[in-house]
């Protein structure tokens, strides 16, 4: 499985949050949701969508989009005098990258307890356990075919 770049910062990991809010703030999560629904949006278009949920300053939206671009979460393209922003990764790619970073950090520091806890959690659901077994078989098959 290919790692997604950039690495997603884990400093703000929030276990009780939903979706990408585990690693992004509330505003950044809302921006990602907007851009996943429709890419290629200007600052004003993103602002209009955000204003449906909350009052927000134009400069806040502008700064947030620029910071998310610099973090590598968004791409942007100049159209006329303004930038148009898109999510750099699909929701699936972003979520996979987030999971890789979280699990990678746990495995790097707590390999045995992390694996044990993971197996315990997966083992609670027969279907999920079957999925894991199939993934392990596929990984071994691909690994063996490279030798």
Residue ranges of predicted features:
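Short helix-coil junctions and helix-kink-helix linkers
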Residues: 48-56
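Amphipathic alpha-helical dimerization/coiled-coil segments
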Residues: 97-142
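Short beta-strand "wing" residues that participate in macromolecule-binding interfaces
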Residues: 76
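Short alpha-helical segments that sit at the start of domains
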Residues: 2-33
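Short acidic, hydrophobic short linear motifs in intrinsically disordered regions
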Residues: 41-49
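Short, cationic-aromatic polyanion-contact patches
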Residues: 24-27, 79-98
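Glycine-centered, phosphate/nucleic-acid-interacting loop/turn motifs that mediate DNA/RNA or nucleotide
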Residues: 72
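Short, hydrophobic-biased segments on the C-terminal half of alpha helices
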Residues: 62-66
